[in-house]
Each structure stands twice: as structure tokens, then as C-alpha cells.
Amino acid sequence: MAKEYSRTQRIGDQMQRELAELIRREVKDPRVGLVTITAVDVSRDLGHAKVFITVMGEETPDAVQQSLKALNSAASFLRLHLGRSMQLRSVPQLHFHFDESVSRGVHLSALIERAVAEDRLHKDADESGTKE
């Protein structure tokens, strides 16, 4: 059976695709680096949309803040273009946020790899100690 999506999820998915293209094509602000839109959460009343981004390359807090500042200042411009490309009566207000899940995932992967390496080291030490 096909998974059912709510209207807000479908609108969020379409907004994610449209915004990625608009940012790549229309936003000329040098503060905006290589931005990837990871998710768009649209409120039930379609009044607001949280746009979650990551910044590839430079993930320093300063670069992230500069990109967020530039995107939030371009939000009305992007909203206008979204209104032209999407068939919506009203386009949600855009609020850009940094998505920390990617960096958290990388950190957790590194912790897991380190734990596995330590386990192997202890296992090898135990095996070499019992053979003698």
C-alpha cells in the first residue's frame, strides 16, 4: 500500500526542490556558499515554512551565520519567485535554519568507528595474551 503524505508534506517537498533551484540560479549574494536544503517543514495553516540548510565546504559557525543572514534577507525575494512557480493561494513565510543533524551524524559515526577500533585493539590484545 502506498504511503500517504499530508498536503503540508507535499508542499514542503515541492518547496525544497523549487528553493534549491532558485537559490542556485537567482541568489547572487557572495555570503551564500554552497547551500543544500535538507528539509522544509510547513505549518498546518501554510503560513510559515522552516527551511533547514547545510553549508558545504566551510562549516565554520561564521560562514553558517553569514549564509543564514543572507538567505533570511533574501526570503521575501525567494517567496515572490516561489509564488510564481508554485500553484498556491498564499506562499508561506520562509525562515531559514541551520540543520545540525548532518554534523551530529558525522560526529556519531566517528565515535562509533573509534569504539569499534578500540574493541578490535582490546580483542587482539586479549587473544595474543591467551595464546602464550
From Swiss-Prot:
InterPro entries assigned to the protein according to its UniProt record, in alphabetical order: KH_dom-like_a/b, RbfA, RbfA_dom_sf, Ribosome-bd_factorA_CS
Domain of life: Bacteria
Keywords on record: Cytoplasm, Ribosome biogenesis
UniProt-annotated location(s): Cytoplasm
Main location: cytoplasm
Gene Ontology MF, one: ribosomal small subunit binding
Gene Ontology biological-process entries: maturation of SSU-rRNA
GO cellular component, one term: cytosol
Self-association and partners: Monomer. Binds 30S ribosomal subunits, but not 50S ribosomal subunits or 70S ribosomes.
Similarity field: Belongs to the RbfA family.
Function: One of several proteins that assist in the late maturation steps of the functional core of the 30S ribosomal subunit. Associates with free 30S ribosomal subunits (but not with 30S subunits that are part of 70S ribosomes or polysomes). Required for efficient processing of 16S rRNA. May interact with the 5'-terminal helix region of 16S rRNA.
Protein name: Ribosome-binding factor A
